Amino acid sequence: KAGQLNLLADPFRWMPTAVNPLDGTGDPARVTAMIREGKVGSLFNGIGAEAGRRIQQVAMEESRLKIPLLFAADVIHGLSTIFPVPLAEAAAFDTQLAYRTARAAAVETAASAVHQTYAPMVDVARDQRWGRNVEGAGEDVLLNNLLAAARVRGFQGDKGLDDRDAVLATAKHMAAYSAA
């Protein structure tokens, strides 16, 4: 059961030699075997709808516990359709815009067999040299709060996570990451 806590960077999607964090190689057969053995609970960066169905079938039909896998990705400012980065979007001071772009990204993400996004990024920018400032809404605490809430609603949909077009939003980097 503890294996279900393992999140692996997906070695199936981006390139055949993608890095497997367990052994430094891209080894889809090994990852598939680990899924069968119940040693993997989620894959990061998605694998596409067709491959997702196939690998989910392995988890559900060939593993002992039959627990479905969770597919996750960083959907910071879109998936197939790319929107302005959150920092640029924040310049509009428009929560409806943040909601609509997150909703559109969620529809594409869910259609790609991804269940969870590591977004929105909610760090308050404290140092303009920090390279990840573009993932958040800047230095204003209130604006960060309002836009993050709008993005969570957009990702998770009006009907909640039961909606087939919803993805689980995971706010990240909350503990002074940009101030470190």
Enumerate the predicted regions with their spans:
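Glycoside hydrolase catalytic-domain context in secreted enzymes
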Residues: 1-180
